Amino acid sequence: MALVKVKPTSPGRRAVVKVVNAGLHKGAPYPHLVEKQNRTAGRNNKGQITTRHIGGGHKQHYRIVDFRRNKDGIAARVERLEYDPNRSANLALLCYSDGERRYVIAPKGIVPGMQLMSGADAPIKNGNALPLRNIPVGSIIHCVEMMPGKGAQLARSAGASVQLLAREGDYAQLRLRSGEIRRVHVNCRATIGEVGNEEHNLRAIGKAGAQRWRGIRPTVRGVAMNPIDHPHGGGEGKTAAGRHPVSPWGTPSKGFRTRVNKRTDGMIVRRRYSNKG
C-alpha cells in the first residue's frame, strides 16, 4: 500500500493523492455476497431531507459483510482482498473448509493464503475473532460488539482500533481512539489487530467532482445564506455570524454535548478527550 501523487495533467488532477494497493482483487465481487442498494439521497419516506449534503453519485452494490464472526471452530483461508465502495476499509473474502464464503473487514497485515478462525478456542492471532473474555488484556482489537451476538459496531473503519484495558466481572473496559473508556460485556466478540488501509485518511480527493462521484453534495456556509435559511445568514455585504457558531436549527456546533442516551450512561467510564476548558 502506497500514496501516489498523480501527474498534474489538469487543475483537477494537480492536488490528487491516491492510495494504491497492488494486492487488491481487480475483478468483480463474489456474486452471492452482493445485493442491490437503493439510494435515498438523504430523504426519508416522506421525501423530506433528513441528512444534508447527500445525493447523486455512482451506483454501487452492497457487499454483505459478516460482522458476527459466528462460524466457530472452522478454519478459513483468505482467498483475496477487495475494494468496497461502501466503506473506508477493504474486505477480505474468506473461504471456509466446508466451502462457504464470507466477507469480513480486512485487518492490517492480512494477505491471501492466511488461515483465520473464530470462536473461544481460536488462537490469539491477527484476524481471529474471539469473545473478550478470551483475549489477553492489553491487546489491540477491532470490530467489537456492543451486545453479544449483535455484530461488530465499534472500530470498523480504516485504521481503527480499540485497546482492551481490563476485565472486571462480567464486563471489560475498552479504550477507544477518541480517549473514551467504555464497558462492554465479556461475551461480546472482537477481532485481533487493527483495521487495514490505514493510509485512507491521507488521500486527497483533488476536485469537487470527485466528491460528487461519491454521492457527496456541496456544503454551503451559513453566513452565505439568507436569515430565513440559517441563524448566521443575512447582513449587508460580508458580515460575521454575530453569535457563537450554531447549526441551522440553533444548536451550538462547537463543543456542545448532544448525547441524550441516558440508558447507557453507566457503560461510559470516562468520556472522550476534550480541549474545551
Swiss-Prot record:
Q: Which domain of life is it from?
A: Bacteria
Listed A to Z, the keywords are: Ribonucleoprotein, Ribosomal protein, RNA-binding, rRNA-binding
Q: Where is this region: Disordered?
A: 225-277
rRNA-binding in keyword set: yes
Q: Tell me the disulfide pairings in this chain.
A: none
Give this protein's Gene Ontology molecular function annotations: rRNA binding; structural constituent of ribosome; transferase activity
UniProt-listed GO biological process terms: cytoplasmic translation
InterPro entries from the entry?
NA-bd_OB-fold, Rib_uL2_dom2, Ribosomal_uL2, Ribosomal_uL2_bac/org-type, Ribosomal_uL2_C, Ribosomal_uL2_CS, Ribosomal_uL2_dom3, Ribosomal_uL2_RNA-bd_dom
Q: Respond yes or no to whether keyword Ribosomal protein is given for this record.
A: yes
Q: Which GO terms describe its cellular component?
A: large ribosomal subunit
Q: What does this protein do?
A: One of the primary rRNA binding proteins. Required for association of the 30S and 50S subunits to form the 70S ribosome, for tRNA binding and peptide bond formation. It has been suggested to have peptidyltransferase activity; this is somewhat controversial. Makes several contacts with the 16S rRNA in the 70S ribosome.
User: Belongs to which family?
Assistant: Belongs to the universal ribosomal protein uL2 family.
On assembly, the entry states: Part of the 50S ribosomal subunit. Forms a bridge to the 30S subunit in the 70S ribosome.
Task: From the Swiss-Prot or TrEMBL record, give the protein name.
Answer: Large ribosomal subunit protein uL2
Organism, per UniProt? Nitrosospira multiformis (strain ATCC 25196 / NCIMB 11849 / C 71)
